[in-house]
């Protein structure tokens, strides 16, 4: 379990329109609003947990982390894309699975606090066989996080450490 309590006697500056995403890597940071010259005002408590499974040779096979921010009251001056302005933020997390060194699957997500909507979903997968590397990305943003959505794939052949040949495609998905 992890916990972060932030207290500021000052009110937040109005940064509600900045383009900043909250993710599992900055959720437990005091600078999570993404502004060097501004502090998050009011009181907040961030709760979450990390879990990992390692192989016998200490290689990480599975890891997950999930967290959520709780505030004593709404603060409409905080970034709308992050849901930090609500009493309880989105549930934010990451799941990584790598059963072998040749396969890595990584998933970042933001789920609405009542878990009925996924507001942000970013899935990456990478498969390496000999010198061939294939990777896939899928992004979907909903509601206040944004409206971008795409699927991309990259196929590469690595001749040596400094030379490779790659082929990339990306399909943007248009949503209303």
Residue ranges and their predicted role:
Residues 2-176:
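Outer-membrane beta-barrel translocator/pore domains, especially the C-terminal barrels
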């Amino acid at each position: 379990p992890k916990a972060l309590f932030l207290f500021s006697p000052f009110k937040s500056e109005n940064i509600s329109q900045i383009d900043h995403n909250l993710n599992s890597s900055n959720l437990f940071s005091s600078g999570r609003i993404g502004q060097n010259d501004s502090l998050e005002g009011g009181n907040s408590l961030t709760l979450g947990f990390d879990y990992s499974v390692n192989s016998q040779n200490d290689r990480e096979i599975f890891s997950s982390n999930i967290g959520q921010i709780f505030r004593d009251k709404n603060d409409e001056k905080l970034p709308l894309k992050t849901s930090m302005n609500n009493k309880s933020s989105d549930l934010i997390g990451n799941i990584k699975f790598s059963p072998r060194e040749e396969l890595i699957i990584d998933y970042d997500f933001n789920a609405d606090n009542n878990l009925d909507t996924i507001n942000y979903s970013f899935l990456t997968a990478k498969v390496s066989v000999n010198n061939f590397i294939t990777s896939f990305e899928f992004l979907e943003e909903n509601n206040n996080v944004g409206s971008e959505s795409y699927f991309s794939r990259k196929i590469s052949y690595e001749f040596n450490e400094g030379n490779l040949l790659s082929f990339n495609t990306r399909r943007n998905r248009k949503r209303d």
